[in-house]
Amino acid sequence: MSKNDVIEVEGKVLEPLPNAMFRVELQNGHKVLAHVSGKIRMNFIRILPGDRVTVELSPYDLTRGRIVYRFK
């Protein structure tokens, strides 16, 4: 899967889960399970419930995603 195939959407973090996973509600109302990308993890960016984030979704599994950006 190339970088061009991903779907980027905005969402809001609902709750933190174990192992750096989060339940995120997307703008269209869907809820997905998302993990934190490596760059966010390396830079120690904290993600809390209520934060607005950008999530990358794979076209193969739209129920899981990767958090790639946290809005200020």
Swiss-Prot record:
<dbReference type="InterPro" id="IPR004368">
    <property type="entry name" value="TIF_IF1"/>
</dbReference>
<dbReference type="GO" id="GO:0003743">
    <property type="term" value="F:translation initiation factor activity"/>
</dbReference>
<feature type="domain" description="S1-like">
    <location>
        <begin position="1"/>
        <end position="72"/>
    </location>
</feature>
<dbReference type="InterPro" id="IPR003029">
    <property type="entry name" value="S1_domain"/>
</dbReference>
<dbReference type="InterPro" id="IPR012340">
    <property type="entry name" value="NA-bd_OB-fold"/>
</dbReference>
<protein>
    <recommendedName>
        <fullName>Translation initiation factor IF-1</fullName>
    </recommendedName>
</protein>
<keyword id="KW-0699">rRNA-binding</keyword>
<keyword id="KW-0648">Protein biosynthesis</keyword>
<keyword id="KW-0694">RNA-binding</keyword>
<dbReference type="GO" id="GO:0043022">
    <property type="term" value="F:ribosome binding"/>
</dbReference>
<dbReference type="InterPro" id="IPR006196">
    <property type="entry name" value="RNA-binding_domain_S1_IF1"/>
</dbReference>
<dbReference type="Pfam" id="PF01176">
    <property type="entry name" value="eIF-1a"/>
</dbReference>
<dbReference type="GO" id="GO:0005829">
    <property type="term" value="C:cytosol"/>
</dbReference>
<comment type="subunit">
    <text>Component of the 30S ribosomal translation pre-initiation complex which assembles on the 30S ribosome in the order IF-2 and IF-3, IF-1 and N-formylmethionyl-tRNA(fMet); mRNA recruitment can occur at any time during PIC assembly.</text>
</comment>
<keyword id="KW-0963">Cytoplasm</keyword>
<dbReference type="GO" id="GO:0019843">
    <property type="term" value="F:rRNA binding"/>
</dbReference>
<comment type="similarity">
    <text>Belongs to the IF-1 family.</text>
</comment>
<comment type="function">
    <text>One of the essential components for the initiation of protein synthesis. Stabilizes the binding of IF-2 and IF-3 on the 30S subunit to which N-formylmethionyl-tRNA(fMet) subsequently binds. Helps modulate mRNA selection, yielding the 30S pre-initiation complex (PIC). Upon addition of the 50S ribosomal subunit IF-1, IF-2 and IF-3 are released leaving the mature 70S translation initiation complex.</text>
</comment>
<keyword id="KW-0396">Initiation factor</keyword>
